[in-house]
């Protein structure tokens, strides 16, 4: 067990107790190891069983979105390959082949219960670009209004750096944010999050409930922890990302009988990662700090840099000396000190690059004259949407 964990975890966190959910919309993510019998091809029996559980929720009026891995593994089987390819082109080809079987199987399993399904293949670029993000959200909203169940997967055929273990955990969390889901369920091959690896330590306890932002979770599931190789780290990170939008996450074994319906009904199976208003802000800042793709740059003077870094203030337009790049309102940009050239923060900007150029170096009282329309925006980047990087 990680150092200090005994003193960090309260016994109440191990107690089975009913969970009071009010769920209208749920995301269910199922990993490759469950879907493919650990790489031996799609487990159609299991898929049909999960479809039956999803159908029960559907009949109750609960909207379900499914994030399904397994395309690459199914492609390997269909091509009779002895092992998973290492070359990117071969991985992408396997994803293209396997995706056909994956969607075909889910469609067949769901249509038996009168549920129409659809395929949605996404990349991180689709979700980091505001215009495509809004288009994707609109499509998902329409599908749900039509009572169609979206089956979402990473578009491994065209991505370069996203074919890696655990990525669909993140994709599911981002989908939860897009549609304002009430619950995110991650089905895995482990019963939940443990204080140690239960395969090695018979005294390991399963954590029944914890805040998604609890730091010690990374200690026991991080890269240096005993559970890191099992992919639990990506699931905890996904739980934190879901927390940013106020969505709780349950990490649970997909092999448990009626697991999906039992989780939604509030039964204490698996590990529940909870969130609150303060956690939303913390999680949002962590997500911003980890954002790899900047849409542009705001160059700020020394006074603005000091206000942001030392006093944790919002970035005001008057402190912005230069705007670089082409971005939309809501995109993530870097904030750079004009004297040192150092990135001091990243944040979600309240203006498009065009409008940001117009209000840069201007005081708030000038905004109506510059932009018109009774302009209500007063900050370039709000402090709740800003994360320091130095």
Swiss-Prot record:
Location relative to the cell: Cytoplasm
Keyword Amino-acid biosynthesis: yes
InterPro entries: AceGlu_kinase-like_sf (IPR036393), Asp/Glu/Uridylate_kinase (IPR001048), G5K_ProB (IPR041739), Glu/AcGlu_kinase (IPR001057), Glu_5kinase (IPR011529), Glu_5kinase/COase_Synthase (IPR005715), Glutamate_5-kinase_CS (IPR019797), PUA (IPR002478)
Superkingdom as given in the UniProt entry: Bacteria
Binding site for substrate: 69, 156, 168
Protein EC: 2.7.2.11
CDD domains per UniProt: AAK_G5K_ProB, PUA_G5K
Keyword Iron: no
GO biological process: L-proline biosynthetic process
Metabolic or biological pathway, per its Swiss-Prot or TrEMBL entry: Amino-acid biosynthesis; L-proline biosynthesis; L-glutamate 5-semialdehyde from L-glutamate: step 1/2
Pfam families registered for this protein in UniProt: AA_kinase, PUA
Family: Belongs to the glutamate 5-kinase family.
Protein name: Glutamate 5-kinase
């Amino acid at each position: 067990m990680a150092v200090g964990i005994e003193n960090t975890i309260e016994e109440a966190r191990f107690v089975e107790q009913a969970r009071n959910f009010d769920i209208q919309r749920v995301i269910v993510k199922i990993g490759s190891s469950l879907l493919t019998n650990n790489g031996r091809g799609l487990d159609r029996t299991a898929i049909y069983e999960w479809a039956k559980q999803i159908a029960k929720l559907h009949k109750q009026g609960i909207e379900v979105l499914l994030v399904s891995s397994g395309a690459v593994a199914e492609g390997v089987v269909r091509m009779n390959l002895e092992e998973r390819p290492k070359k990117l082109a071969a991985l992408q080809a396997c994803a293209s082949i396997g995706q056909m079987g994956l969607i075909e199987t889910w469609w067949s399993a769901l249509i038996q219960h009168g549920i129409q399904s659809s395929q949605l293949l996404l990349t991180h670029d689709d979700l980091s670009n505001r215009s495509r993000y809004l288009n994707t959200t609109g499509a998902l909203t329409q599908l749900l209004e039509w009572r169609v169940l979206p089956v979402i997967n990473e578009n491994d055929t065209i991505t370069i750096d996203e074919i890696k273990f655990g990525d669909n955990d993140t994709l599911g969390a981002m989908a939860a944010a897009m549609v304002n889901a009430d619950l995110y369920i991650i089905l895995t091959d482990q019963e939940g999050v443990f204080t140690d690896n239960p395969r090695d330590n018979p005294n390991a306890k399963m954590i029944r409930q914890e805040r998604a932002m609890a730091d010690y979770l990374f200690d026991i599931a991080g890269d240096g922890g005993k559970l890191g190789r099992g992919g639990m780290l990506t699931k905890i990170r996904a739980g934190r990302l879901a927390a940013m939008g106020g969505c709780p996450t349950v990490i649970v074994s997909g092999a448990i009988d009626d697991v999906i319906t039992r989780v939604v009904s509030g039964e204490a199976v698996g590990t529940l990662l909870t969130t609150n208003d303060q956690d939303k802000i913390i999680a949002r800042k962590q997500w911003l700090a980890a954002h790899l793709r900047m849409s542009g740059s705001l160059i700020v003077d020394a006074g603005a840099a000091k206000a942001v870094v030392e006093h944790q203030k919002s970035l005001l337009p008057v402190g912005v000396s230069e705007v670089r790049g082409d971005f939309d309102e809501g995109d993530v940009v870097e904030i750079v000190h004009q004297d040192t050239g150092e990135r001091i923060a990243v944040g979600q900007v309240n203006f498009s690059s065009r409008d940001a150029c117009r209000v840069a170096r201007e005081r708030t009282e000038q905004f109506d004259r510059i932009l018109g329309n009774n302009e209500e925006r007063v900050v370039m980047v709000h402090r709740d949407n800003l994360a320091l990087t130095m």
